[in-house]
Amino acid sequence: MKLRCFFQAAAVTCLVAGCAAGSQASSKTDACSDSSAQACDAAGEPAKGDYGFIPMEFDDAVSLFQEGKSGLLYFGFPDCPWCREAVPILQQEAAAAGVDIYYIRTRDDERNRLYSDEQKERIIPYLKDYMDNDENGVLTLYVPVIVAVKDGKVTAGHVGTVDGHNAKLGEMTAEQKKQAEAEIQTVVDAAKTK
């Protein structure tokens, strides 16, 4: 199983990123756990300086899908260990392809959720393939999540880093980075296809 940041889908809300706690190694982080000291969720609108990405509010991400628009979306937050591993790769691949990245931050600096349950519910139809059930059976979005959207539909996506990588324990190996680069490049390439 991949380690990753995730957001809880129990209540309908936007994507959030948090650090997965527990014994199972994952390539993503649990972002919805408001009570978790390890929650890693992106929040608010980052300045263009945050990774050099274009800030996008959660409601605007939902509207992008509903209005049939296109773009490369990144859901995550600065304190998420898996996001910190994936962002440099995403930056590199997007720069090489000349693709802008829209950043949806799911938690603020105090790791408070920046989305409502209603917002989360509205995004589920578009991102359910990139969500998973948490240990309580609640549909959750783990971050980082990178999706290419064309005409309001996800054409490619990537969750977490790579299978077998636990960002809490260390950085990706050279082989894991190569695998992550290939997977993220596929998503970026799908976003540049007009």
Regions inferred by a protein language model and the residue ranges of each:
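C-terminal motif of bacterial Sec signal peptides marking the signal peptidase cleavage site
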Residues: 16-18
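The canonical Cys-X-X-Cys-His
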Residues: 80-83, 146
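Typically the conserved alpha-helix immediately C-terminal to a functionally engaged Cys/Sec
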Residues: 84-97
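Non-catalytic, surface beta->alpha helical segment in thiol-disulfide oxidoreductase systems
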Residues: 137-194
